[in-house]
Amino acid sequence: VANPTQLEAACEDFMVDAIDEARQALKTHSPGAKVELLPVFGNHDRKTSFSIYRFLYAWYRNVDDVITPLDADERVYRQYKDWFISATHGDVSKKTMRRMPEIMMQEARGINADTERMILYHGHLHEEVIKVQSGIKRHQAPSPADPDRYDNRNAYVNNPKVLPGHVLYGNGPDDQFL
């Protein structure tokens, strides 16, 4: 069984690998520090990513150091210290992506008013790109998925397959945002 993008690995294998990778990352980063998962669901793999997140939610729901909100919005907004953090899958038009800083500020005005630095995480294009756009650090994350037909046609086949995680440190060793 393969998912709609015809991944080389079976959907079930992909889900198990993604869950194991996420649990390993949480095991590495969560001892002694709170970690919050930001649920971001894709377009063609929305059911798969939602299922993976629901598993992680159930696994960590009684663990004090791991925060697992049940957001299912297209874009997720958080504040950490003076950081305004946004995450989205990124399956929008290039024009909308260029407007993402403006969209962030409009949709989360309270967070925008209380922060000095902004960062946007998104994926969708399966390759890693980091750039500053309108004063906002934009991190386009690589994908944990095997190449699909689109990737093969566009020569994205050598991109690393990773489950991206990011740590923003605050003032102390137990003060981090993953």
PLM features per residue range, with description:
Residues 1-70:
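Core catalytic region of metal-dependent phosphoesterases/phosphodiesterases
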Residues 48-50, 77-81:
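Short, solvent-exposed polar/charged micro-motifs at secondary-structure junctions
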Residues 56-58, 62-74, 81-178:
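Conserved beta-sheet core of the metallophosphoesterase superfamily
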